[in-house]
């Protein structure tokens, strides 16, 4: 029996795109910082002049799938990370945005064969979102680790 796993080693050559929602940017900027910190610590050049990473801003989480699709189709990236923050309000808008964003991102990943990390926080309150994007527990770091592992795993199976 073969065991196939992704690793975090030899990830310094990985080409990554991050698609990030501007809505709730107090949160998404923190997620981006955590993400970039993790990638940098694993050898990926995250400087402004880097040819390893690109960051695309979209208005909100609902728009993440379409830009992810276009970036994945370029063939330039080995993995994408989507970042967003959807906080429950008094209307059903939350449910619609979360449902469509998650389904859309999953569909794009399956159809293009490019792993896309779903880094969209879905919380009931702003406080919950801040806790998940904070200094002690920044999920942006975790999303970047998932991207490194999936990039490595895809290389191992293809």
Curated annotation (Swiss-Prot):
- NCBIfam families xrefs: lumazine-synth
Catalytic residue positions? 93 (proton donor)
Q: Which UniProt keywords apply?
A: Riboflavin biosynthesis, Transferase
- Residue pairs linked by disulfide bridges in the UniProt entry: none
Work out whether the entry's keyword set contains Transferase: yes
The pathway to which it is assigned is: Cofactor biosynthesis; riboflavin biosynthesis; riboflavin from 2-hydroxy-3-oxobutyl phosphate and 5-amino-6-(D-ribitylamino)uracil: step 1/2
CDD domains tied to this protein: Lumazine_synthase-I
MF terms (GO), sorted A to Z: 6,7-dimethyl-8-ribityllumazine synthase activity
As for what it does, the entry says: Catalyzes the formation of 6,7-dimethyl-8-ribityllumazine by condensation of 5-amino-6-(D-ribitylamino)uracil with 3,4-dihydroxy-2-butanone 4-phosphate. This is the penultimate step in the biosynthesis of riboflavin.
Official protein name in the record: 6,7-dimethyl-8-ribityllumazine synthase
> Which protein family is it in?
Belongs to the DMRL synthase family.
- Can you quote a single GO CC term? cytosol
Looking up InterPro entries in the UniProt record yields:
LS, LS/RS, LS/RS_sf
């Amino acid at each position: 029996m073969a065991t196939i796993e992704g690793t975090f080693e030899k990830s310094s050559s990985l080409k990554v795109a991050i698609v990030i929602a501007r809505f709730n940017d107090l949160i998404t900027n923190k997620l981006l910082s955590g993400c970039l910190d993790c990638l940098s610590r694993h050898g990926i050049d995250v400087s402004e002049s880097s040819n390893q990473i690109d960051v695309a801003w979209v208005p909100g989480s609902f728009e993440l799938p379409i830009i992810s699709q276009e970036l994945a189709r370029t063939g330039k990236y080995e993995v994408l990370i989507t970042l967003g923050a959807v906080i429950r309000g008094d209307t059903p808008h939350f449910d619609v945005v979360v449902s469509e964003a998650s389904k859309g991102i999953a569909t794009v990943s399956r159809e293009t064969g490019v792993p896309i990390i779903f880094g969209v926080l879905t919380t009931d309150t702003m406080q919950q979102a801040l806790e998940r994007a904070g200094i002690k527990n920044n999920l942006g770091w975790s999303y970047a680790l998932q991207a490194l592992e999936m990039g490595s795993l895809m290389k191992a199976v293809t």
